[in-house]
Amino acid sequence: MKLYPTIGLEIHAELLTSSKVFCTCSAEFGGEPNSRCCPVCSGLPGTLPVLNAKAVEYIIKAGYIMNCEISRFTKWDRKNYFYPDLPKAYQISQMPRPVCLGGHVDVTVDGEQKTMRINRIHLEEDAGKLVHDDIERVSLADYNRCGIPLIEIVTEPDFHSAAEVIAFFEKIRLMLQYAGVCDGKLEQGSMRCDVNISLAEKDSDKLGTRTEVKNLNSTKAIQRAIEYEIYRQTELIENGERVVQETLHFNDATGETSSLRSKEDAHDYRYFPDPDIPPIIFTEEELAAIKADIPEMPEQRVARYTGEYGISAADAKVLTDSKRVSDLFENAVKAYNNPKPIGTFIVVELMRRINLGELDLDNMKFTAEDLAKLIELAETGKISKDNRKIILREMLETGKKPETIAEEQQLWIKEDNALLEKTINGIMEANPKAVEQYRSGETKVFGFLMGQCNKALKGAASPASIKAMLEEKLKG
């Protein structure tokens, strides 16, 4: 019997608001435990929530970039359950009237484009965080995260492999970063993914019993959890055992899932309207203004880079696969309007250093303007392209301006014609065979002779000057 996995996702993304969704406490990550709480987010009796308008704006932007229909009327509900990280014993969420309905996002997996449907996106408050101390045998509650605005993106069960899930998750993350809605910092828990998995025969109209793996916050964890759960369910079914509908925890250390609790359905949470938060009716003018404020998305930047700047599609994709890289490129082009060499340098030189861990864009010692100046110095013939790498290395280490480094290390190109002629004569005398080959029509050796001259001159003359004089000398 061939079993076929069907997967649906619930992606939770924290919004980039400065304050929490129903109070004025800071929504910034970190802080001393329980230092960013107030009576509202701590769930004390007699407090009233006040809705953060910026959070509503951000969920509408998220809906638009995912091709959702924005509800003209929306309201909030109480999702009732008890857990130590939820001081009110209910979570303010949305059930029958979410802000966003429907929608889809296209992803490419193994060269094939697939459309993944979205069921809904709703706005809710995050819960707190439990810290378990195995030595003292206690669990500590940190409520700093309580009340941070969160959107939950609920997909249709359109996924059938870990590769499809990861492609979708990464694209959603990138889109939210570009829209300025979520920072996508997985290591800080800004985005988390719950994965619902069931197995059934490929042509069956009926899905199997589903399990939910909770709170996966890295693509590696998502992949391993899906692969293990498919394996576990396959073993159960093939051995004639029953798959239990339950919520699971994924253990990073063992690579296995374990049961947390039975899997709840919506009616188990006893949703009812929150009486303290009035519904919202959006006007067409309000929605149009929010939509007009959405920044350029990655696909739009790729089209502009290839169409206006003449950058290759492959390089344009590299430049836009990270918002930080793309913003660096954008700001450098503003400082020096020569996009193609800037883009090539970022793709070839900076990306290599980023991948090697030599450059962290969040803690860069030089600015986009410094990068632009470095490219300009090389493109205008003031430094050689070899010396450009030397200057970049120093910029990475010290943050000094490229002009300062060029001056300190005497890396400027000095057009000394006497030195240039003497060097070329010496290279030709040292390589008589190559000279003869060139004069006999084997012009390929010109590159070799140019390389020898560049190496000997060490940036003391521009490539154009070297080329012109070398060609003249070789004519005999």
Give the positions of each predicted feature.
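Amphipathic alpha-helical segments in well-ordered regions
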Residues: 62, 229, 332, 345, ...
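Basic, nucleic-acid-interacting segments
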Residues: 1-296, 313, 334-338, 348
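Strongly charged, low-complexity linkers/loops
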Residues: 361-372, 376, 385-455
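Core structural elements
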Residues: 189-201, 306-330, 339-356, 369-371, ...
